[in-house]
Amino acid sequence: MMGRQAATLAGLKPLRLFFHAPGIAAHRPKLSLPLITGAQTTTTDSIAGLYPNHMLTGNRGNIIHAEAPAKIFTKSPGGSTYGNLAEILQLIGADFATRMSRSFDMVIISMANFIRPDHDGTRLLSSLKALEDKIPVVVLGCGLQGNHKLSDMMPGNAALIEWFNQNAVIFGVRGEKTANWLHDNGFKNADVLGCPSLYAYPHSIMGLDGSSARAKGAAAEVMTAGYVKIANGAIAPRGVELARAFRKISASYVFQDEPWSFEELAQMRGLYNEGNNEFRADLLNDWLGQRAGGTLPFKRYYYFNEAGAWRHAALRHDVYIGDRFHGGVAALQAGVPAIFLSHDNRVAELTEHFGLPHLTTKAFARKGLPAVLEEYLSPEVMQAMKTLYRQRSREFFEVTARVGLTPAIQDLQVPEMAPAAPPVPFRQKMRRLARRFR
């Protein structure tokens, strides 16, 4: 029934879309007044002061994938909104389904890697059951974390997967590994679509060029991210390995959720400057270094409240090389090339789906920055990635078109690959021409 209803929406534009995901870090007003928006948090300069803002989105990688559907699809600007289905159900109760179906044409949910044993889908599931057969629901970005049995999942999460499989008009998953796991467990209605965050800024992806980073070699400015967090009084081994790999590299590090493991620093005033989204690197390099067996090497430590600042900061760098997928996507969205350090199936699945360059941190440290840039940002690699990206985009929008969702930008052409260097005779002709005008 919902599939037929969604299909009829193709001729009804603009759609009123409800986005279930925190694409921005803003408080949700509890007042029942029209034409109001949530306020941002008050400026702070400490980790403890940042915590209420952090809880608006959780891990900051969430804002990259959660804002993407709102960026991609044409919609009614005044009739569309972000929100939390479970919280709205709790507030308005029995009238929930009626009011939602009257107010919106479709619900879009950005889920990320929720197929794991520690995720409980009970609250979201309750709200979706209330909406069943009332409003079409699209789910994007679903991913598997680890490789667990279905019986390892919390009952509410297993039931949420079942609901998506049976009722969502699109059950979009990140890649083949997730789709195969679902199929093996009896869930056979998933579409492999990748992460929506890659489709938000297609001109940036198609304009990627690794030549500047390759030319700078060891002098390239690098943005990175990973797991430099405290566990049992020491930095996690994965974070230590990353820091060591960057010892002789000019790099900035982006936090996503790590500062809340720095309990000893939580109340320190002046540690963070919200104006430039930076923590004090001099203090953190020393403090973290004491827990890592040596001073950390990073020039800057970033923490972002919204995605635009993240993208803008990426432009200060020549390349992203890091152990967080959405940290790399933020760079790609800004037109900065990215190389992903891959250590689990979350990153591997997405980099393979889009043909994004990836290797392990150990391999990166062994090869060295100049060699990695030459190998992974070569014109051939970039061209192949763009060709596959265009194919993935076409697949994504063919599926979303089935339910009436239309992208504002689509069907970009793959730019022709420029030669690595002009042929020698051409350079000689240019020199002769230049001498004529001296």
Predicted region positions:
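Active-site anion-handling motifs in enzyme catalytic cores
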Residues: 2-438
